Amino acid sequence: MCVRRVDILSRFDIALSLLQSLTHSHTVLRHLCFLPTIIYKHLCEFTISFSSPVISTGQHIDVGDEDYHDGDDDVDYTDDVDDVDDPHGSPSQLLQGGYQRNQHYGGGNYQSGYYRPNKQHGNGYGGQYPKKYGSGYKH
């Protein structure tokens, strides 16, 4: 082990003396003291430039069953209640349709955040108002 260490030191000395004889200047030798620091700095910059930071783009990633509806998932929202004869339906059927729809959102009528009536039920007011006075949500 000692022989190897001496061998490395002697090679360093040879390189140093060769460099000194080539330049005839002590300026290069002074800058050689900072060489390890400069190499380390460049290695750190190289590593940082090739790492991939995680940047949030704010885009929606579809993960399947969601607790909210943002238009990106592929659940069919029109076929939840098929047994309604009247296009508006009775209040209980409207609630049932809302409950079945909101099962996509994780539970009961109001647990999911908002109630969106089934399209085949009109605007959700049982025909009392014209469709344009519905919930304000474009169905």
UniProtKB/Swiss-Prot annotation:
Residues 61-139 are annotated as: Disordered. This is Immunogenic miracidial antigen 8I. It comes from Schistosoma japonicum (Blood fluke). Residues 64-85 have a biased composition (Acidic residues). Belongs to the immunogenic miracidial antigen family. Residues 90-103 have a biased composition (Polar residues). Coiled coil: none annotated.
